[in-house]
């Protein structure tokens, strides 16, 4: 989800300055995952880092709840990167094997907390890069009693690439991602052909990719990208190609902003099909 505007900080530290994390619970690291001498080329990301100012409640959440809900992953060149060779040990993290849902960009955690609490039979992992949003999400997970949810502070595409294997995911959610309106910024859109191929590889056959946006041009961009992926097929799509609103998805402040501004909310639901 899109964060509220905040003053921009320098986007990332250099590889020499980058903070490196030790692997957290449930993270397997293969040989070569921390090769500090390697030259790393940073790719295009779908976000701009902002200053991590937190209020008292958010700071308290980071101090008291991070050890419960935040998965610390090995880093590569930046504080939101993921080291190649890392892999989540999901049974170790959750203490069981259960269907897994991943959310890209949890924002303030409204969707993650509500649906994790509503579905204790499933496990949930949310990606987010903004520290205040993560802290707010930790509070909401705790208040909801969502012990089956975790958060990772990382670029979601790197996380999908390095932390999960083929067919690990039952569902993936991308709700109200930054639309990056300017044409020269379209390469930053999280929904793009490369991400679609990656998501398809991580979804099990029959798994779902649920998306929503309040911007018409991004909605049609998503539709074009997903339609070009041969292993994804639309679910309950109308003549315009869009799906009905998923009734379980809570109305967040991001969706409310779009509705208040008079924009149409577009939902897309696509299923990963078997290769044949």
Swiss-Prot record:
PROSITE patterns in the cross-refs: SAM_MT_TRMB (PS51625)
Record GO cellular component, one term: tRNA methyltransferase complex
One matching Pfam family: Methyltransf_4
Reactions listed under catalytic activity: guanosine(46) in tRNA + S-adenosyl-L-methionine = N(7)-methylguanosine(46) in tRNA + S-adenosyl-L-homocysteine
Positions bound to S-adenosyl-L-methionine: 103, 128, 155, 178
This enzyme's EC code(s): 2.1.1.33
Domain of life where this protein originates: Bacteria
GO MF term set: tRNA (guanine(46)-N7)-methyltransferase activity
Keyword flag Phosphoprotein: no
Coiled coil: none
Annotated active site: 178
Signal peptide location: none
Binding site for substrate: 182, 214, 252-255
Keyword terms, alphabetized: Methyltransferase, S-adenosyl-L-methionine, Transferase, tRNA processing
Disordered: annotated span: 1-23
Pathway where this protein functions: tRNA modification; N(7)-methylguanine-tRNA biosynthesis
Family: Belongs to the class I-like SAM-binding methyltransferase superfamily. TrmB family.
Function: Catalyzes the formation of N(7)-methylguanine at position 46 (m7G46) in tRNA.
Protein name as it appears in the record: tRNA (guanine-N(7)-)-methyltransferase
Organism: Cutibacterium acnes (strain DSM 16379 / KPA171202) (Propionibacterium acnes)
Origin organism lineage: Bacteria, Bacillati, Actinomycetota, Actinomycetes, Propionibacteriales
